């Protein structure tokens, strides 16, 4: 438990900082552009991470929203209940996960439709011999063909959105104080470590996507959708009263923020 607490302490000192929430979106956008330029101008040699079957891609990135959802669910519930003691407020804050699920579902559906309506089936990856009889990606692949359309990077979208959402929710740790004897201490500490490492995986795999996969425009649109999903919720809607709201803050901190705004 002592090692876990040390990890949690380090993660609190990094991911929970307001500077991280402020600059991470810009860092992701900049690294996506830099990685994409590197891919176009001086491609890196193939490696384990450039293989789509690598462990991180198969068991984490492919189900990134499931990991994010399953770890944020108990984290939001425990930290918000610890601070407020109000079940209604906890349920309201948990609805952020429903909103996130809706954003994930709608965006991936949009990407799939764009790839469908802009694509065609070919006999080879070199786009030779168009097979007009196959009108869908599933049918094309089923017949051994290769579908080529505008494939917006789902990884760039989802990894951006998940990383930013986790960092936003971990801001509550500024207010959460538990000692070793507290009944929630072990659970919250474990979740902090798990979410911290998950965030680093998302950022690392986002960088791998930038330097190994998709073209620049596909990654630009994917990252843009992720940033819009984050900013539209945490930057706009969640500031309103008719929303799931932001992570709870102490009255003293709110007073300081109100004074600063004035």
Curated annotation (Swiss-Prot):
The keyword Hydrolase applies. InterPro entries: FIT, FITM1/2. It catalyses: an acyl-CoA + H2O = an acyl-4'-phosphopantetheine + adenosine 3',5'-bisphosphate + 2 H(+); (9Z)-octadecenoyl-CoA + H2O = S-(9Z-octadecenoyl)-4'-phosphopantetheine + adenosine 3',5'-bisphosphate + 2 H(+); (5Z,8Z,11Z,14Z)-eicosatetraenoyl-CoA + H2O = S-(5Z,8Z,11Z,14Z-eicosatetraenoyl)-4'-phosphopantetheine + adenosine 3',5'-bisphosphate + 2 H(+); hexadecanoyl-CoA + H2O = S-hexadecanoyl-4'-phosphopantetheine + adenosine 3',5'-bisphosphate + 2 H(+). GO terms for cellular component: endoplasmic reticulum membrane. PANTHER family: ACYL-COENZYME A DIPHOSPHATASE FITM2. Fatty acyl-coenzyme A (CoA) diphosphatase that hydrolyzes fatty acyl-CoA to yield acyl-4'-phosphopantetheine and adenosine 3',5'-bisphosphate. Preferentially hydrolyzes unsaturated long-chain acyl-CoA substrates such as oleoyl-CoA/(9Z)-octadecenoyl-CoA and arachidonoyl-CoA/(5Z,8Z,11Z,14Z)-eicosatetraenoyl-CoA in the endoplasmic reticulum (ER) lumen. This catalytic activity is required for maintaining ER structure and for lipid droplets (LDs) biogenesis, which are lipid storage organelles involved in maintaining lipid and energy homeostasis. This is Acyl-coenzyme A diphosphatase FITM2. It comes from Bos taurus. The gene is FITM2.
